[in-house]
Design a protein with these regions (language model features):
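Short, polar loop motifs at secondary-structure junctions
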Residues: 32-39
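NAD(P)H-binding glycine-rich loop region in Rossmannoid oxidoreductase-like domains
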Residues: 3, 31, 47-98, 102-105
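Oxidoreductase cofactor-interface core, primarily capturing Rossmann-like NAD(P)-dependent enzymes
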Residues: 22-25, 121-220
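N-terminal Rossmann NAD(P)H-binding glycine-rich loop of SDR-like oxidoreductase domains
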Residues: 1-25
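Active-site beta-alpha turn of Rossmann-fold NAD(P)-dependent dehydrogenases/reductases
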Residues: 7, 76, 112-115, 150-152
Length: 220
């Protein structure tokens, strides 16, 4: 399987990247980035390469590079805290759909989008509405398969760290009791590894639901 990955430098994206590198059935990973960076996982060069572009609102200049890939994993996103709706929409809707249209034109069959628990196009919270609109647009875009991932709390594992110090402190504190918390709150807690493995599984084998909640993701 050949995978395109957006958001590889974020916490979730790092987890997805790691699972792709470790999976022997994944033969290639194309990371779409704004700036070239050093590989974060030991010697993945034979499998992982970067596509550098500074325009995430229009991929037409580089979309030929997407041809020949089977699935696109999209984990790029920002927190809505402190953002006005127009600004949040520009990042959450415009970039996501620009990427989706480009990979679809290139013949990519499967699109997997990391959304969030509580996403609802008719919800009261701004972020939930915007993400819900994004999900609906992706589901109606014409991919052979499209899956919306709605994890709750995602705990980083295997040395992966959040770029936000406060979040990382919370994750570090939770890690020793994670197995207990997952049994107590299966609908709300997953790990970066589970998200990555679930993405690979649904892209490879399909899944009966197009929208996967945390409990679905944690089952992989």
């Amino acid at each position: 399987m050949r995978v395109i990955l957006f958001g590889a430098t974020g916490m979730v994206g790092q987890g997805v990247r790691r699972e792709c590198v470790l999976d022997p059935e994944v033969e290639a990973v194309l990371e779409v980035v704004r700036r070239a960076s050093a590989p974060a996982l030991g010697q993945p060069g034979e499998k992982v390469r970067e596509l550098v572009t500074d325009n995430f609102y229009d991929f037409s200049a580089v979309e030929n590079a997407f041809a020949g890939y089977d699935a696109c994993f999209f984990s790029l996103g920002v927190s809505s805290v402190g953002m006005k709706e127009a600004e949040y929409r520009r990042v959450t809707v415009d970039i996501t759909l620009a990427a989706a249209r480009a990979v679809l034109r290139a013949g990519v069959a499967t699109f997997v989008y990391v959304s969030g628990a509580g996403t609802d196009a008719n919800g009261r919270a701004m972020w939930a509405r915007v993400k819900g609109e994004t999900e609906n647009a992706l589901l109606g875009m014409g991919f052979q398969a499209a899956y919306m991932f709605r994890p709750g709390l995602i705990v980083p594992m295997a040395g992966i760290r959040s770029k936000t110090a406060v979040y990382q402190a919370v994750y570090s504190a939770l890690r020793p009791v994670l197995p207990l918390l997952q049994r107590m709150f299966p609908k709300h807690i997953t790990t970066t590894g589970q998200v990555g493995r679930a993405m690979l599984a649904v892209a490879r084998h399909g899944y009966p639901k197009q929208v996967l909640e945390a409990a679905d993701i944690a089952s992989f």
